[in-house]
Amino acid sequence: MYYVAQVIKDECSKYNCKQCTLFCPEPNTLMYTDEGHHAYVNTLRCKGCALCVYVCSELLKRDSIEMVYAENRDVAGVR
């Protein structure tokens, strides 16, 4: 199996930054909900490149996205 991104909703909603959505190379994969104030992943489209994890963890120091095995994913991509 492969890895896909998963947003940690409670952590992500603290920042309301939307930066990760700007860097995902796959269209309509990493999106943002204004209602919940957090990003979410369409795990069926996620290619597992982990660029969003790099942006969130390394550049922004927020640790709101993690990579999980595709077999353990949920459709919404939010934990």
Curated annotation (Swiss-Prot):
Signal peptide feature range: none
Positions that bind [4Fe-4S] cluster 2: 24, 46, 49, 52
Chain positions recorded as [4Fe-4S] cluster 1 binding sites: 12, 17, 20, 56
Record-linked SUPFAM superfamilies: 4Fe-4S ferredoxins (SSF54862)
GO molecular function ontology, one term from the record: metal ion binding
Cofactor: [4Fe-4S] cluster
Gene3D superfamilies: 3.30.70.20
EC number: 1.-.-.-
The record's free-text note on cofactor binding: Binds 2 [4Fe-4S] clusters.
Segments forming domain 4Fe-4S ferredoxin-type: 3-35, 37-65
UniProt-listed Pfam families: Fer4_10 (PF13237)
Keywords, comma-separated and alphabetical: 4Fe-4S, Electron transport, Iron, Iron-sulfur, Metal-binding, Oxidoreductase, Repeat, Transport
InterPro entries linked: 4Fe4S_Fe-S-bd
Keyword Electron transport in record: yes
Subunit: Heterotetramer of one alpha, one beta, one delta and one gamma chain.
Protein name as annotated: Ferredoxin oxidoreductase 1 subunit ForD
Species name: Aquifex aeolicus (strain VF5)
Gene that specifies this protein: forD1
